[in-house]
A protein has these predicted regions:
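N-terminal helix-turn-helix DNA-binding core of bacterial DNA-binding proteins
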Residues: 7-49
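Short polar/acidic secondary-structure junctions
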Residues: 43, 68-70
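Basic amphipathic alpha-helical segments that dock to polyanions
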Residues: 50-52, 56-57
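Glycine-centered, phosphate/nucleic-acid-interacting loop/turn motifs that mediate DNA/RNA or nucleotide
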Residues: 61
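Short beta-strand "wing" residues that participate in macromolecule-binding interfaces
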Residues: 65
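Basic, amphipathic "hinge/linker" alpha-helix immediately C-terminal to the N-terminal HTH DNA-binding motif
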Residues: 71, 75-93
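Amphipathic alpha-helical dimerization/coiled-coil segments
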Residues: 86-109
Length: 109
């Protein structure tokens, strides 16, 4: 098994959580999420991965979106967390802290 494969799977597993964290801070246009924020965090994502994930989160009532006129080109779809999304994110944060604590405990034995 290659290390790169494991690292890739770990990143994919955290993608939903990271997107929700970004949208908790402010609504975002999908390309902003792809090009800037996730890339800066070394979570490289292609549109074929991001858009189905955003759609699933929206269908689960965790995200909503609104169309905003653009100064260049067509209107843009800005995503934001719903109230239910905020609650779900809180649950994910608890799970992340528990998982992180567990890994740190094992690593420091």
């Amino acid at each position: 098994m290659k290390v790169d494969n494991v690292k890739s799977q770990m990143r994919k597993g955290m993608l939903e959580y990271c997107i929700m964290l970004l949208l908790h801070k402010e609504p975002a246009y999908a390309s902003d999420i792809i090009i800037q924020k996730l890339k800066e965090a070394q979570l490289i994502v292609v549109e074929g991965t991001l858009y189905p994930l955003l759609t699933r989160l929206k269908n689960d009532d965790l995200l909503s979106y609104e169309w905003v006129e653009s100064t260049q080109g067509p209107p843009r779809k800005y995503y934001k967390l719903t109230e239910q999304g905020e609650v779900f994110l809180g649950e994910l944060e608890i799970s992340w802290k528990e998982l992180n604590d567990t890994v740190n405990h094992i690593a420091n034995r």
